[in-house]
Curated annotation (Swiss-Prot):
Transmembrane segments: 27-47, 63-83, 100-120, 133-153, 176-196, 219-239, 280-300, 326-346, 386-406
Subcellular location as annotated: Cell membrane
Effect annotated for changing C483 to H/S: Unable to be phosphorylated
Comment text on domains: The EIIC type-3 domain forms the PTS system translocation channel and contains the specific substrate-binding site. The PTS EIIB type-3 domain is phosphorylated by phospho-EIIA on a cysteinyl residue. Then, it transfers the phosphoryl group to the sugar substrate concomitantly with the sugar uptake processed by the PTS EIIC type-3 domain.
Residues of the PTS EIIC type-3 domain: 4-405
Description of what induces expression: By lactose. The operon consists of lacABCDFEGX. A second transcript of only lacF and lacE is also lactose-induced.
Residue ranges of domain PTS EIIB type-3 in the record: 476-577
Gene: lacE
Active-site annotation: C483 (phosphocysteine intermediate)
Lineage of the organism: Bacteria, Bacillati, Bacillota, Bacilli, Lactobacillales
Name the UniProt record assigns to this protein: PTS system lactose-specific EIICB component
Primary role: The phosphoenolpyruvate-dependent sugar phosphotransferase system (sugar PTS), a major carbohydrate active transport system, catalyzes the phosphorylation of incoming sugar substrates concomitantly with their translocation across the cell membrane. The enzyme II LacEF PTS system is involved in lactose transport.
GO biological process: carbohydrate derivative transport; carbohydrate phosphorylation; phosphoenolpyruvate-dependent sugar phosphotransferase system; phosphorylation
Amino acid sequence: MNKVFDKLKPVFEAIAANKYISAIRDGFIACMPIIIFSSIFMMVAYVPNAWGFYWPDNVTNTLMVAYNYSMGLLALFVAGTTAKNLTDSKNLELPKTNQINPVAVIVASEISFVILSILPLKTGVDLTYMGTQGLICAYIVGLIVPNIYYVCIKNNVTIKLPEQVPGNIAQSFKDLIPMGLSVTAFWLFGVGFKAATGTVLPRWIIQVLSPLFQASDSYLGLALIAGAMAFFWFCGVQGPSIVQPAVVPIMIANTAANLQQYQAGQHVSHVLAMNTMDYVMNFGGTGATLVVPFIMLFAARSAQLKAVGKAAFVPCTFGVNEPVLFGMPIIMNPMLFIPFLATPIVNVCLFKFFVSVLGMNSMMYTMPWTVPGPIGILISTGFAPLAFVFVLLTLVLDVAIYFPFIRVYDSTLLAEEKAKEEVIEDDGMAVLASDTVSPSIPTGLTVATATDDDATHVLPETAPSAHGEAYFKQNEVDVLVLCAGGGTSGILANALNKLSKERGLKLSAAARAYGQDMDLIKDMNMVILAPQMESMKGNLKKITDKYGVKLVTTTGRQYIELTNNGDMALDFVESNL
């Protein structure tokens, strides 16, 4: 089985690292604060309805102003952020002295999107497709405009002014031709498209893709989405980074439609909403692993699983399940393949049954993915009475699915630990080795530097410090830790910052989700890339090489140990400077 996954992994990594998929994913992530912020006003306006309290109409309308003019313009913002992220990738292919202006690209993309999306009315304009219903069109615009700029800048199709002209003025004229070409191209396309179809592009896209929207809400569609995320992760590639860009427009549109149904007093019926992925499919992280650390904590007999359970139950509660994925491990572990794939599928099909058959309201609010799954389900469904039953039943089913497989795996590890102890005792060594037994996880780390090209060095896990703490007391060192969602990277950065403060060191660490790091990298001395983002190493190395920053990657087990041991994390940084 592992040989098959080893062959598939490079293909999945190439998909995840594709610059266009990355631009869509990172462009959406950049707009998440808008979605969460606007949802706060929406929840204040409508969550009290669950307890029979209704605001006066003027209060509700006032609260919804913030929602309507943030989420109502989401596609406009996404067009800009998607274009910006693709521009950053394109700039890596250009000389440092001849770069695309990201601000100009954002402006051109947003103008082009508005031209394609607004429907003129007799009095005013229709802004329907500036929000969630225009997301696919926004992605299209955000991916095309940077390429127009790239062709113009690369081939010097720009207006050049004398050297005596100030740089900011010269840049404005340099951007004139690519901006003019971009806006004019979309204007001509919009005019021709409307003449041919009688409607604007976003509306036409929704009409054409409506069967796909409906299919994604079916049992089969939901199972494929949930299973695909788990399958990719099992192969070692961050699943949501591949699946999410394809389904985000559907999830956001469904969430908005659900809210409209609720406001109209109708049954909230769309199953695939934003938080369905976060709280149902990924109940405690990809693979629905919320119950896994608790099973290990209370039922495991092997030292390895007991230790992982102890370290993982808090992060998993908040949807950060890397300690489980890499600590057990689940990734590439045939013993845990079936429950890891089956549990999220069972969860989402059960959710579909509760919504479609039992009449429970689906999710109409968008909460941060780090909210514990049971709490997030209750809030997102507006505290629907059946949601309480669903949460309890989901917990029971997840335990029932995972428990027998974990028990078998635990027995295997326990036997290995006992065998190891016997060997040590036979050699006359009074050392208990069970805590360090990890036959399926290699140790060591890989370091890629700006002078290293594609070569890598494998260092021992306990590499000696190159400088000692005295170095950090005399020199400022900035470290950036990157992971998929900012969860484990935050834990590691906090551990480094805490020790730095306690010992008076000039070491500063920052944490980001991958894709939110471009502006920080140039000011860093080191970037630590979490193992779940290994597929992005090639793209990231181009950026770190550009700024002469050291890029360091770790194995899964070592990364988890670093997040749980501040001294080890500090030694790790020291040994790589």
